[in-house]
Amino acid sequence: MRFLILFLALSLGGIDAAPPVQSRIVGGFNCEKNSQPWQVAVYRFTKYQCGGILLNANWVLTAAHCHNDKYQVWLGKNNFLEDEPSAQHRLVSKAIPHPDFNMSLLNEHTPQPEDDYSNDLMLLRLKKPADITDVVKPIDLPTEEPKLGSTCLASGWGSITPVKYEYPDELQCVNLKLLPNEDCAKAHIEKVTDDMLCAGDMDGGKDTCAGDSGGPLICDGVLQGITSWGPSPCGKPNVPGIYTRVLNFNTWIRETMAEND
């Protein structure tokens, strides 16, 4: 099993370490420039770690397993190696993981049937509000359940190869199908709960991967998921990936933002 994160790992020049659980985009394509204006790049110090989602000028949503001790973020980025004047850099004043996420599962261990990665979400409060522009825009929280069979778009700067990780400079997108949770429950030893979504390509070859954690899953134009965890290697046939079901956490998200604004 893999998280879709690089714990303290991915920099512009390479990788220092790999996590027990990872997620990246395999089998995707270069996103159209500025087509994902809510996409956030979350760094630990100066090293890229995870994706994120801009909810409003003050708040970024990401995965709880992306928790670290020193955040900064980039908004409106497309290519890590290009100077993009429209991109915005922000520091983070507060990180609030969901209180029910089991952080102890981040320690390397052999996957167990009782492993439950539910509640894998975290809010980041920006120290300075984002400037909302054509290339930096928030996305709304969902208001209804996604439909099974929907085509969903995941995006991120995670690995584009399933085993020997290689990371793109350009933001990647991949189209995935929203599948019944039963498909993921059959494919994974870990628990698959109602707080998760199952998405992928049952033929294999398309998936999120190491470095995509915390990024968005957009189904029929609506934010529905946060990239969380999945198989290792990525993109295995009949082994879809797991995403945090955002709709189930709308109340916690809204209340947490209101209490900390």
Curated annotation (Swiss-Prot):
Record keywords, A-Z: Disulfide bond, Glycoprotein, Hydrolase, Protease, Serine protease, Signal, Zymogen
Active-site residue numbers: H65, D120, S213
Which SMART domains does the entry link to? Tryp_SPc
Supply the residue numbers of the propeptide(s) excised during maturation. 19-24
One of the entry's Gene Ontology molecular-function terms is: serine-type endopeptidase activity
Enzymatic reactions: Preferential cleavage of Arg-|-Xaa bonds in small molecule substrates. Highly selective action to release kallidin (lysyl-bradykinin) from kininogen involves hydrolysis of Met-|-Xaa or Leu-|-Xaa
State which residue ranges cross the membrane: none
Which top-level enzyme class is recorded in the Swiss-Prot or TrEMBL entry? Answer: hydrolase
What GO terms in the biological process aspect are recorded for it? proteolysis
All disulfide bonds of the chain are: C31-C173, C50-C66, C152-C219, C184-C198, C209-C234
Write down the PROSITE patterns for this protein, in alphabetical order.
TRYPSIN_DOM, TRYPSIN_HIS, TRYPSIN_SER
Instruction: Tell me which residues are glycosylated.
Output: N102
Q: What is its EC number?
A: 3.4.21.35
Residue intervals of the Peptidase S1 domain: 25-258
- Function description: Glandular kallikreins cleave Met-Lys and Arg-Ser bonds in kininogen to release Lys-bradykinin.
Similarity comment: Belongs to the peptidase S1 family. Kallikrein subfamily.
Tell me the protein's name.
Kallikrein-1
State the organism named in the record: Mus musculus (Mouse)
